[in-house]
Structures are given as structure tokens and as C-alpha cells.
């Protein structure tokens, strides 16, 4: 069983439409769609936006369905200048950009008693690299940062990039999903398509390109599942 999590309806609708033998299961406020995708058993859910929603849905999917791995799919704002709208980014690791316990000796972004970076499963990364090379996806592998804010100004973007110079993209759920997977010892990977450049026009770009970003991210998830 493979778990797939997206935050928004647009980010899961394409995959949901391609499920066969689908059953809908509701747990608390969350709906799960269990079926087959490319002949593989999967369970798909729309978590809702933000870190708490993501953590709740990840906990439920792990406890209820016991997936062997979790894929987080969706969109992100680019922080790295090499990324353009429509490009794909795969997580090497994920970090919170809105956590600060430095007063107690922790690094910026580090939850107390947790690692600073939550690293993607290396075998999953190898599988993704195989897919990228075979399908010629315009994709890069790098760090993704998460926080409970939509980054829609140049000042916000520059602040995050200054504090987390390795960060290539920013979004609102991935690190919460990764932390939950870390706690439950479940491998994870994040696939995000760039929907905006996290600048003063980010809100307009996001609305315009979310659909295309969802198509791109869903496509790489489908291709990845084929080789798992």
C-alpha cells in the first residue's frame, strides 16, 4: 500500500480520477480514497492546507492503512532562481522555515528534540531519479521549506532564502508530513511543481498555474508508482 497526500482538491483530483476499484472511507473529517493506480494498491487523501491538517491526515493514513511509504504531491513557490513556473522539485530534505527555538540552543527551523532536516528516503530518491531520466522531466532535487504562510512578497522570499540558503522552494505542508513519517518510521518523498515564484505576483501566478502544477506533480507520481 502506497499513501499519497495532497493539500488541495486540484492537487489530488487528477490522481483520484485515475483510481480503479476505488472505495471512499471517512475517518474524522478526512476522506480517503483507496484503490489501484497503475496496478498498485494506493490510498489517496486531501489533507487540507497547513501543517496541522497535514500532520493529522498523515497520522490517520498511517494508523488506518499502514502504507509502506508516503508520497506528498502538490505545488510550491520557487525560492531558487534556477526554477521557473512549471518546473518540478523533488525533496532531498524538508525543513520548517517558521520555527524558532534558538533561545534554547536549537538551530533555526528545528523543533526541539527533532532533527533540523527530515530527509527523504534514499531508495525513493533513486527511483525518482530513474523516472526523471527516463521521462525527461524538467525536475531538480533539493531542499523544500514549509510554514503556515503563503509567501507572496519579495521581502518574505528574501528573508527565507537568507535564513535557509539551501532552500529551493516553499510551501505549507511537506515538513509536517515528513515529521509525522519520521515519528512513525515511514519512508516519504515530496514531489512539488512550481506554481509561482514566491514574489509580489505570487497570488496571481498561483491561481493561474495551480492546475498546470497539479498536472505536472500528478504525472511524476504516476510514473514513480510504476517503478515502486
Curated annotation (Swiss-Prot):
Pathway: Amino-acid biosynthesis; L-methionine biosynthesis via salvage pathway; S-methyl-5-thio-alpha-D-ribose 1-phosphate from S-methyl-5'-thioadenosine (hydrolase route): step 1/2. Transmembrane segments: none annotated. Gene3D superfamilies: Nucleoside phosphorylase domain (3.40.50.1580). This is 5'-methylthioadenosine/S-adenosylhomocysteine nucleosidase. One of its GO terms (molecular function) is adenosylhomocysteine nucleosidase activity. GO terms for biological process: L-methionine salvage from methylthioadenosine; L-methionine salvage from S-adenosylmethionine; nucleoside catabolic process. The active site is at residues 11, 196. Catalyzes the irreversible cleavage of the glycosidic bond in both 5'-methylthioadenosine (MTA) and S-adenosylhomocysteine (SAH/AdoHcy) to adenine and the corresponding thioribose, 5'-methylthioribose and S-ribosylhomocysteine, respectively. Also cleaves 5'-deoxyadenosine, a toxic by-product of radical S-adenosylmethionine (SAM) enzymes, into 5-deoxyribose and adenine. It comes from Staphylococcus haemolyticus (strain JCSC1435). The keyword Nucleotide-binding does not apply. Belongs to the PNP/UDP phosphorylase family. MtnN subfamily. Coiled coil: none annotated. Its EC number is 3.2.2.9. Substrate binds at residues 77, 151, 172-173. GO terms for cellular component: cytosol. It is an enzyme of class 3 (hydrolase). Pfam families: PNP_UDP_1. It catalyses: S-adenosyl-L-homocysteine + H2O = S-(5-deoxy-D-ribos-5-yl)-L-homocysteine + adenine; S-methyl-5'-thioadenosine + H2O = 5-(methylsulfanyl)-D-ribose + adenine; 5'-deoxyadenosine + H2O = 5-deoxy-D-ribose + adenine. The lineage of its organism: Bacteria, Bacillati, Bacillota, Bacilli, Bacillales. Keywords: Amino-acid biosynthesis, Hydrolase, Methionine biosynthesis. InterPro entries: MTA_SAH_Nsdase (IPR010049), Nucleoside_phosphorylase_d (IPR000845), Nucleoside_phosphorylase_sf (IPR035994). The gene is mtnN.
